[in-house]
């Protein structure tokens, strides 16, 4: 009887634990693109239709399941404002069920160098896709052209246009290099750790010019390269070239990530200024960054978007009937005066989120010109929140304060669920480490609790953007969108993107600001705005 009673008690305890966790969350992001259904990964073929003022996003897509698998297609979405996206029919399909239309890029062939177009097609809509055809036997570079502005495509009859007798040769990114009047392609010899650079007159015949190889973090393989001219923040008329390389697996924090190199390009060779591998985004969920072929100049010349997930756990993310979202589109510039530490300035990629919201609520300012103490924490009511909101926090550390290294001297923000405040995000800054931290593990979603690769806690080093009157100032902008968080520190000098998951319907209901020490933190500004 004792054994029977014990087993009954144990079963009841297990049932209680199971009931306290949920398997899925159906809260879809509002301002981050997600497919209606199915699986999505890398962004592809980004371009701007100048005739119709329309932005095009293509992406790796499996409409038949919520995990990666073949056949793999190019999904398609369009936008008028880079924030609100409309799903379109599949754009490019593979020829076999065991194959895939893998990642690639789009160009606008204004001058009809390919010969695919006649005068009935507006030069601004002469788009050609350059993509990898993947089969179990090989990876080869194909091209397809569109006669209707990027909605349907015809495959070039003489494909492939580039082959290397390899199963690891992919992700062509093509742009027009004006000085030489040639098309330039970067493509990854993934497991040779090479980014090969090719040139072409017509998009059909390609000449190998050089290779950028064995640089930075190697990981298991290189993927999704890109080469783009990026203007400097200090003087937009001046620019440098940036080489982007994705790594998967083998990222320093686990799984996948993006790195970049700053240098020069002469039409055939890219040369990095130094041997530093720089990190594009310090979060766990930002991969396969691709930049737009062309842009609306009012937004800037260097725009990009990334897949907001990580290959370590992307197949297990608890959303349904879709998996994965894209990051916000970001405007990139180069800060040539980035203060890496008090003695060194570096060239650093700066990111600014592009967010066009017509129905956002007003900014509500909750703290201004205030010294934070343990007794005067701030509580912000978000009971009408949809689960998507922005916040801005400008704070300073009193450098005259002496704090023991054994004290966790933090400023913390607690974003709590409305229906269940035991689910929350905690983020903030700790003085001794000079780092901003995030804890995304306080959830009752089973995936968050049980998946060992979904790192609950992470941090990123922060340096002050200014110091005056014994105060060192820091700035952070954050966007929380149902299950994805983007953080921009000091106007985008450092960025961190991470997903998080709470029980379905448990929208953010409050924000609390606390500290563990008195009179250390000065709050210059803290404000919140709901996105509806």
Swiss-Prot record:
Keywords: Cytoplasm, Glycoprotein, Glycosidase, Hydrolase, Secreted, Signal. SUPFAM superfamilies: Arabinanase/levansucrase/invertase, Concanavalin A-like lectins/glucanases. CDD domains: GH32_Inu-like (cd18622). One of its GO terms (biological process) is sucrose catabolic process. Belongs to the glycosyl hydrolase 32 family. Present with 1780 molecules/cell in log phase SD medium. This is Invertase 2. It comes from Saccharomyces cerevisiae (strain ATCC 204508 / S288c) (Baker's yeast). The lineage of its organism: Eukaryota, Fungi, Dikarya, Ascomycota, Saccharomycotina. The gene is SUC2.
């Amino acid at each position: 009887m004792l054994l029977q009673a014990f087993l009954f008690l144990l079963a009841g305890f297990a049932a209680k634990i199971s009931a306290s966790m949920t398997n899925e969350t159906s809260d879809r992001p509002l301002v981050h693109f997600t497919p209606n259904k199915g699986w999505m990964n890398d962004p592809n073929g980004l371009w701007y239709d100048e005739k119709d003022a329309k932005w095009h996003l293509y992406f790796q897509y499996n409409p038949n399941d919520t995990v990666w698998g073949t056949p793999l297609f190019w999904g398609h979405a369009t936008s008028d404002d880079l924030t609100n996206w409309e799903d379109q029919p599949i754009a490019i399909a593979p020829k076999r069920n065991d194959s895939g239309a893998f990642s690639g890029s789009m160009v606008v062939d204004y001058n009809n160098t390919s010969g695919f177009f006649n005068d009935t097609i507006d030069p601004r809509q002469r788009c050609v896709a350059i993509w990898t055809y993947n089969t179990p036997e090989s990876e080869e570079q194909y091209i397809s052209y569109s006669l209707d502005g990027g909605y349907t495509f015809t495959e070039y009859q003489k494909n492939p246009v580039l082959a290397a007798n390899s199963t690891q040769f992919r992700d062509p990114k093509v742009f027009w290099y004006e000085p030489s009047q040639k098309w330039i392609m970067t493509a990854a010899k993934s497991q040779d750790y090479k980014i090969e650079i090719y040139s072409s007159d017509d998009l059909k015949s390609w000449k190998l010019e050089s290779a950028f190889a064995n640089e930075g973090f190697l990981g298991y393989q290189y993927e999704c390269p890109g080469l783009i001219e990026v203007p400097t923040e200090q003087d937009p008329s001046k620019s440098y070239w940036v080489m982007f390389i994705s790594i998967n697996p083998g990222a320093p924090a686990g799984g996948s990530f993006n790195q970049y190199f700053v240098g020069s390009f002469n039409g055939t060779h890219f040369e990095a200024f130094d041997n530093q591998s720089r990190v594009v985004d310090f979060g766990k969920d930002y991969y396969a960054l691709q930049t737009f072929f062309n842009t609306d100049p009012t937004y800037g010349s260097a725009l990009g978007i990334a897949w907001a997930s990580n290959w370590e756990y992307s197949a297990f993310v608890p959303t349904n009937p879709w998996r994965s979202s894209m990051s916000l589109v970001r405007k990139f510039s180069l800060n040539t005066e980035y203060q890496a530490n008090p003695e060194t300035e570096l060239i650093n990629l700066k990111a600014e989120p592009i967010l066009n919201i017509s129905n956002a609520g007003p900014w509500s300012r909750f703290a201004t010109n205030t010294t934070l103490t343990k007794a005067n924490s701030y509580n912000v009511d978000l009971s009408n929140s949809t689960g998507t909101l922005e916040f801005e926090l400008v704070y300073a550390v009193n450098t005259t304060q002496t704090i023991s290294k054994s004290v966790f001297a933090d400023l913390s923000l607690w974003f709590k669920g409305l229906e269940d405040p035991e689910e929350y995000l905690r983020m903030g800054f700790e003085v001794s480490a000079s780092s901003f931290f995030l804890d995304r593990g306080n959830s009752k979603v089973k995936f968050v609790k049980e998946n060992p690769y979904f790192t609950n806690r992470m941090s990123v080093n922060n340096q002050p953007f200014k110091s005056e009157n014994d105060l060192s100032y820091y700035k952070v902008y954050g966007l929380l969108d149902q299950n994805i968080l983007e953080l921009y520190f000091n106007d985008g000098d450092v960025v961190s993107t991470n997903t998080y998951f709470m029980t379905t319907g448990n929208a953010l209901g409050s924000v609390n600001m606390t500290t563990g020490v008195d009179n250390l933190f000065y709050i210059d500004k803290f404000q919140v705005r709901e996105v509806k």
